[in-house]
């Protein structure tokens, strides 16, 4: 019994460690709410070129993000999608707070082509424009830090379809 207990504790620690690593890859910078971070990552494309636009995100995360999608719409329009019927999130079947856009939007998908772990300013990206539907996860706003005009806000771009 003791070896099994010891082995299971090691497995549990390994699993928790892996979850911590995965969680840290999706972590937001502390100074932002989830809605603010969503807007930075998926709405505010600061340049027409992915390589330049991704520098903003990469500087916050201190790493080259593998891929990212910028929706060419407004934050208010995405907030309106939060009012569409709830659905199960495709990327996490235990979450039921996803909503699909009712129409396609122009978007730009950025894909890392030149990793640069030593200097994130040198990360290079290819970009693919498209018109697609999207699915977002929405939650109640952060009462202390998000503006009160939107009680429910997008917090995660779950899928583009």
UniProtKB/Swiss-Prot annotation:
Query: What catalytic activity is recorded?
Result: an [RNA] containing cytidine + H2O = an [RNA]-3'-cytidine-3'-phosphate + a 5'-hydroxy-ribonucleotide-3'-[RNA]; an [RNA] containing uridine + H2O = an [RNA]-3'-uridine-3'-phosphate + a 5'-hydroxy-ribonucleotide-3'-[RNA]
What intrachain disulfides are recorded? 50-110, 64-123, 82-138, 89-98
User: How is this protein annotated for GO cellular component?
Assistant: extracellular space; lysosome
Task: Please give the chief subcellular localization of this protein.
Answer: other
Places the protein is found: Lysosome; Cytoplasmic granule
Question: Where is coiled-coil annotated?
Answer: none
Which Gene Ontology MF annotations are present? lyase activity; nucleic acid binding; ribonuclease A activity
- Key word Glycosyltransferase present: no
For binding substrate, which residues are annotated in this chain's numbering? 65-69
Sorted alphabetically, the keyword list is: Disulfide bond, Endonuclease, Glycoprotein, Hydrolase, Lyase, Lysosome, Nitration, Nuclease, Signal
What residues make up the catalytic site? 42, 156
The subunit structure is: Interacts with and forms a tight 1:1 complex with RNH1. Dimerization of two such complexes may occur.
The protein here is known as Non-secretory ribonuclease
What organism does this protein naturally occur in?
Nomascus leucogenys (Northern white-cheeked gibbon)
